């Protein structure tokens, strides 16, 4: 209504959006669906490099969605760059976001670094075996830090987030802008 149009790219479960927002569905292998969480896709379901990324990362014990989704989003956006002036990444921070940033101006919102979640889970882990599993699962966090350090525009939602992101991800404070939620 203010002269701009918003489009969203999303994977399962697909978001319910305002009717004025056009959704481009980026189907995944849906490994984390509610009915069959952790299902292993059959080989004939692997139809793209994104699918291969998703299943191999998951098979290695890593949360695969950020990398696989960012790759799918890049492939979808690459064919439609003329339609967009700006891309807003909401904390995916997969390597595909760096590729998107090369073809379209990109801003990232970081609510808080997942390093905080990882640190809390590691502290609560009862034994070394569980800590190894947690470290593997959060393997994507290193990628998110690398991507965040290379993105020029980062929106954060609190002063605590600025402190955590700067400390844990090595992002220069001068590239973060505080925008309160609400």
Predicted regions and their residues:
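Active-site proximal beta-strand in glycosyltransferases
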Residues: 86-88, 101-126, 176
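Short beta-strand->alpha-helix junction loop in the catalytic core
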Residues: 114, 161, 180-182
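Short N-terminal targeting/anchoring amphipathic segment
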Residues: 76-94, 107
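A short, histidine- and acid-enriched strand-loop-helix "catalytic/donor-clamping" loop
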Residues: 94-96, 112-136, 150-153
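A short, active-site helix/loop in glycosyltransferases that binds the activated sugar's phosphate group
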Residues: 97-100, 141-175
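A conserved catalytic-core segment of Leloir-type glycosyltransferases
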Residues: 9-74
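Membrane-proximal helix-turn-helix segments that form the acceptor-binding/catalytic region
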Residues: 74-78, 131-154
């Amino acid at each position: 209504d203010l002269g701009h149009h918003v489009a969203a790219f999303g994977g399962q479960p697909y978001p319910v959006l305002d009717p004025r927002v056009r959704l481009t569905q980026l189907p995944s292998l849906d490994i984390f669906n509610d009915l069959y969480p952790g299902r292993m896709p059959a080989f004939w379901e692997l139809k793209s490099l994104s699918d291969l990324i998703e299943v191999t990362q998951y098979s290695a014990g890593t949360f695969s969605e950020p990398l696989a989704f960012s790759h799918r989003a890049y492939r979808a956006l690459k064919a439609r760059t003329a339609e967009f002036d700006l891309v807003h990444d909401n904390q995916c921070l997969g390597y595909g976001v760096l590729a998107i940033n090369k073809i379209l101006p990109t801003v990232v919102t970081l609510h808080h670094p997942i390093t905080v979640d990882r640190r809390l889970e590691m502290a609560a882990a009862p034994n070394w075996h569980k800590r190894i599993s947690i470290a593997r699962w959060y393997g994507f966090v290193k990628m998110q830090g690398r991507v965040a350090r290379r993105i020029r525009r980062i929106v954060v939602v609190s002063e605590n987030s600025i402190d955590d992101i700067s400390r844990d991800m090595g992002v220069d404070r001068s590239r973060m802008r505080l925008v309160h939620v609400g």
